[in-house]
Amino acid sequence: MRLSSAIVVFVALTCTVSAQWRYRDPTAPRTADGKVDVKAPPPRTASGTVDLSGIWQTDIKYNFNLGADLKPDDIVMLPGAQALYAERRDNDGKDDPEGFCLPPGFPRVNGVPFPQKIVQLAGTIVILYETRTTFRQIFFDSNHTLANDPQPTWMGYSKGRWEGDTLIVETTGFNDKTWLDDAGHPHSEQMKVTERFRRPSFGQLFVDITIDDPKVYAKPWTVTQAFQLMADGELIEYVCNENNLDVPHLVGK
């Protein structure tokens, strides 16, 4: 087992502190005792669209294995990808770029033990990630140059649209340097990730994530991640190079 995995477990136990730069949200609905009413209806924008804004965090298990909730035959790798996956596991994940303070990439960034902040604007949704101090932009303009002519990047380029109260986001333009999780699930530059965001209440967010990569997987596969609202808090700065104790202790071939 890599030391990095042990460190991640420790961080997972303390990650709520990392986001709790205490700040009372004056817009949040409250119960009689002053606590945030997480069961209240979701907020809406002036145009009536569900507002996804807030600080959110999902289960760290998705960093260890993005397919943690799936059956083994739900994820079918092609022979070359299967060989790469086995090599990474045999090598104890020593070559995982995330262990060298490189970006975790998307969608892996969701599962790392640090929160993310969704900022919903009129024509763009911005997602700020505490880890690596990185971000995503979701563009709603179908003619947006970045989204239509992407250059390969760690996080890809995202285009969004609303279908009722569900936000659908399609992300392409990835490089092939990232791993989907600590287990070493691979992907190629042809990967397309489709998300379906649903916020049924003030304190709940569900995101269906579909991985479609014909160079790596025999069929698309989908995982649903449940996010909890981290109310009355704020992101704080995280600098990986100041916290990275992994490299001198990495094991493997």
Q: Language model features by range: what are they?
A:
Residues M1-S5:
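Positively charged n-region of N-terminal signal peptides that target proteins for export
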Residues V9-V11, C15-K253:
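PEST-like low-complexity, intrinsically disordered acidic/proline/serine-rich tracts
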